[in-house]
């Protein structure tokens, strides 16, 4: 009886934990059989004769053995069904995670002070199966952090190329961190529109690590931001970074930390009235800084800022920057003034305003019709064209020096040829030049003639001194012949100039009365 009651208790417990409907039906049938068997056993013990007891005992043993075998079969079927469910769940997880390979996510990383989430790239699925704290099966993913802040998070460049000689435990860099799939969060893309003064950011330095800092000023036109780094030397603390080298910290956790720190600071500062006044000043400065940042978002210049200082070395912008002006904001203490300079307008002299408006309407309402800059550019274009024409005219013009050098001083001509060329010089060519130019050229040619005569005298002395050397005599004869040809050419040129000067003097005498 006690064994039957124990078996009935086991069946009732199994019935409470059973989830499959077919298994529950089998357990209910077994429970009914046990209850009937217990009822029959009690009736038999009360009114059965003593000679039938051994036979009934054998029947009870057979029934108990059959009950045990059925329980074992049910337990084996339940365990096999559980194993199949776990394998199916694990296969679905692997299929899901394999499809996520190559996607960006936010993965946890264990630091000495706790766990922090960083953006990462899923690069593979690990073969090992893990069990969560709730008893749920899960797979592990291998991720590479895109914004590493510590050496152990920095991806190994040799591992990415497949050439790393160290395994994962011995390499100083990361071969990919293993994280559970359930701990993966959504990727947080950088939002550069939230860059503002005192915004915490991560900045990329040459060591390939992202260091923490705070924004000092932002230039949304050139997409450059100045950041004050935390924990750096004084000389290298403030640097300029491009937007792609920054990651704004805009998570809810950062905002909660900032709010909690502000609340604690405000509670401490409220202890004295002087500190309260300083807080009001800080709030006012923050409000003005926020207005400047809002103006940066809406500023869309049509031209490069400071283009009017192209020829002034930018002294105006430098002075304004010294006085606290931020590029891209408007003028004034609140940054609500104009951004681009006022263009100067020059109206036609002696015309009424109505006539000027009619001229502007005739030009299709052009606002820059009377602009000084446009007139200056038009004058510059006109002057440039005039300079080009003057250059072409001067390049085609032939003066007396060029004409004489090209026509008379041509190389390889004999003295007779020089005289013939000099005779063929046209009078109208020389008549194009002034008397002063002819006088200067005459003096120059006279000096050249005297120089050639001195050279010829030196060569003649050398000939007389070295009469016994045949080779030297030959070279000196060639030099003498060359000097004679050049002297003949210069003399012919001098005669042409003298003739022109004499002609002009004769004409002047003819015109005098």
UniProtKB/Swiss-Prot annotation:
Coarse class of the protein's main subcellular location: nucleus
Subcellular location per the Swiss-Prot or TrEMBL entry: Nucleus
Zinc finger (C3H1-type): 155-178
Chain spans, region Disordered: 252-282, 478-513
Biased composition annotated in UniProt, kind: Acidic residues: 252-261, 272-282
Low complexity compositional bias, start-end: 262-271
UniProt-recorded Gene Ontology molecular function terms: DNA-binding transcription repressor activity, RNA polymerase II-specific; RNA polymerase II cis-regulatory region sequence-specific DNA binding; zinc ion binding
Residue ranges annotated for the G-patch domain, each copy included: 312-358
Superkingdom to which the source organism belongs: Eukaryota
Keyword Signal: no
Ranges of compositional bias, category Basic and acidic residues: 496-513
Ranges annotated as biased composition (Polar residues): 478-495
Entries under SMART domains matching the protein: G_patch
Sorted UniProt keywords: DNA-binding, Metal-binding, Nucleus, Repressor, Transcription, Transcription regulation, Zinc, Zinc-finger
Protein name in UniProt: Zinc finger CCCH-type with G patch domain-containing protein
């Amino acid at each position: 009886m006690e064994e039957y009651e124990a078996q009935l208790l086991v069946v009732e417990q199994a019935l409470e934990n059973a989830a499959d409907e077919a298994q529950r039906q089998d357990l209910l049938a077994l429970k009914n059989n046990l209850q009937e068997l217990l009822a029959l056993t009690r009736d038999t013990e009360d009114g059965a004769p003593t000679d039938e007891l051994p036979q009934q005992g054998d029947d009870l043993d057979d029934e108990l053995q059959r009950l045990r075998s059925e329980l074992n079969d049910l337990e084996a079927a339940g365990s096999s069904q559980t194993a199949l469910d776990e394998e199916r769940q694990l296969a679905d997880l692997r299929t899901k995670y394999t499809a996520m390979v190559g996607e960006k996510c936010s993965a946890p990383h264990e630091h000495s002070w706790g766990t922090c989430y960083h953006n990462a790239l899923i690069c593979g699925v690990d073969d090992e199966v893990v069990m969560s704290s709730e008893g749920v099966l899960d797979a592990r993913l291998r991720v590479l952090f895109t914004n590493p802040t510590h050496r152990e998070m920095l991806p190994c460049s040799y591992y990415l190329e497949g050439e790393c000689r160290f395994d994962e435990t011995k390499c100083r860099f990361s071969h990919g961190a293993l994280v559970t799939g359930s701990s993966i969060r959504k990727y947080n893309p950088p939002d550069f529109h939230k860059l503002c003064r005192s915004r915490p950011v991560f900045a990329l330095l040459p060591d390939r690590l992202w260091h923490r800092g705070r924004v000092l000023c932002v230039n949304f036109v050139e997409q450059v931001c100045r950041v004050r780094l935390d924990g750096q030397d004084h000389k290298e603390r403030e640097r300029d970074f491009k937007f792609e080298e920054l990651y704004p910290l805009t998570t809810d956790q950062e905002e909660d930390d900032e709010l909690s720190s502000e609340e604690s600071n405000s509670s401490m500062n409220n202890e004295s009235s002087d500190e309260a006044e300083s807080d009001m000043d800080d709030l006012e400065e923050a409000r003005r800084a926020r207005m400047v940042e809002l103006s940066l978002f809406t500023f869309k210049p049509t031209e490069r800022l400071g283009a009017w200082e192209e020829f002034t070395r930018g002294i105006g912008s430098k002075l304004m920057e010294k006085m606290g002006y931020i590029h891209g904001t408007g003028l004034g203490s609140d940054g609500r003034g104009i951004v681009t300079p006022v263009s100067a307008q020059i109206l036609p002299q002696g015309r009424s305003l109505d006539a000027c408006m009619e001229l502007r309407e005739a030009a299709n309402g052009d606002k820059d019709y009377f602009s000084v800059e446009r007139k200056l550019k038009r004058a510059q274009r006109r002057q440039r064209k005039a300079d080009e024409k003057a250059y072409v005219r001067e390049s085609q013009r032939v003066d007396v020096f060029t004409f004489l050098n090209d026509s008379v001083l041509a190389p390889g001509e004999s003295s007779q040829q020089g005289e013939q060329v000099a005779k063929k010089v046209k009078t109208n060519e020389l008549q194009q030049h002034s008397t002063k130019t002819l006088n200067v050229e005459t003096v120059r040619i006279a000096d050249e003639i005297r120089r050639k005569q001195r050279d010829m005298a030196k060569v003649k002395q050398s000939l007389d001194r070295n009469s016994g050397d045949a080779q030297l005599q030959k070279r000196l004869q060639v030099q003498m012949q060359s000097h004679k040809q050049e002297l003949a050419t210069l003399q012919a040129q001098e005669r042409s100039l003298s003739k022109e000067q004499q002609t002009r003097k004769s004409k002047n005498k003819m015109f005098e009365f």
